């Protein structure tokens, strides 16, 4: 079979480019593709890393990037290397603009429906729901990503966000003085990421939750020393196993998920070399 390298470059989650790539590859049964994912490329420093990899691993480039300067840099670089650089929805947007007489404002995301990517996303969402909050730990081998962290560190919404981007994500809470699942003693292929937060901020979030639930007695849940120990213990667990840790104190769900996706795809790209 003929090998084909495809670089998927996006300022978002690469799902649009990935969907287009899979739909196109379905027309070629004799091709053996190797896809490199480059999500959340939103500045020149991140793009430099991508360009370096494109230079060392020549292949077709599919991109969805809204920033004009980044697009110019990418297309010029590929032109000089004499490799195809294709805007996945650029032609469509241009024709819509010409036909309607309305100027282009920005590139919008879109999805091909009912292709492999669509069903991968549905499966990932189902997986995230069934493996929320430490459920079905015997099925962690089917995950792409495992999140660990104290309660209320945005593990569940981050898992769902990642699932909407096609990544099967399980999450496991860490509770002070409770035994942690023995999976941490094993070598696993999945990306494990620890989520921590400023203890004072976490106490605020937990107190708000207790008030909403009208629960008055749960001292350990909002005790500063215990909350601090929970975060420190998660850091310790991750550092001992070289698992990345993300402080979510000032990050939105999207920002946290973007960091995790970047780590995940960097790891995947590394093993695809």
Curated annotation (Swiss-Prot):
UniProt cross-references to InterPro entries, sorted A to Z: Kinase-pyrophosphorylase, PPDK_reg
Assigned EC number: 2.7.11.32, 2.7.4.27
Binding residues annotated for ADP, in chain numbering: 149-156
Pfam families: Kinase-PPPase
Sorted UniProt keywords: Kinase, Nucleotide-binding, Serine/threonine-protein kinase, Transferase
One GO MF term attached to the UniProt entry: ATP binding
Keyword Transcription: no
Reactions mediated catalytically: N(tele)-phospho-L-histidyl/L-threonyl-[pyruvate, phosphate dikinase] + ADP = N(tele)-phospho-L-histidyl/O-phospho-L-threonyl-[pyruvate, phosphate dikinase] + AMP + H(+); N(tele)-phospho-L-histidyl/O-phospho-L-threonyl-[pyruvate, phosphate dikinase] + phosphate + H(+) = N(tele)-phospho-L-histidyl/L-threonyl-[pyruvate, phosphate dikinase] + diphosphate
Top-level lineage group: Bacteria
Keyword set includes Transferase: yes
Broad class of enzyme this protein falls into: transferase
Disulfide feature: none
Protein purpose: Bifunctional serine/threonine kinase and phosphorylase involved in the regulation of the pyruvate, phosphate dikinase (PPDK) by catalyzing its phosphorylation/dephosphorylation.
NCBIfam families, alphabetized: PRK05339.1
Family designation: Belongs to the pyruvate, phosphate/water dikinase regulatory protein family. PDRP subfamily.
Protein name: Putative pyruvate, phosphate dikinase regulatory protein
Species annotation: Rickettsia bellii (strain OSU 85-389)
Lineage: Bacteria, Pseudomonadati, Pseudomonadota, Alphaproteobacteria, Rickettsiales
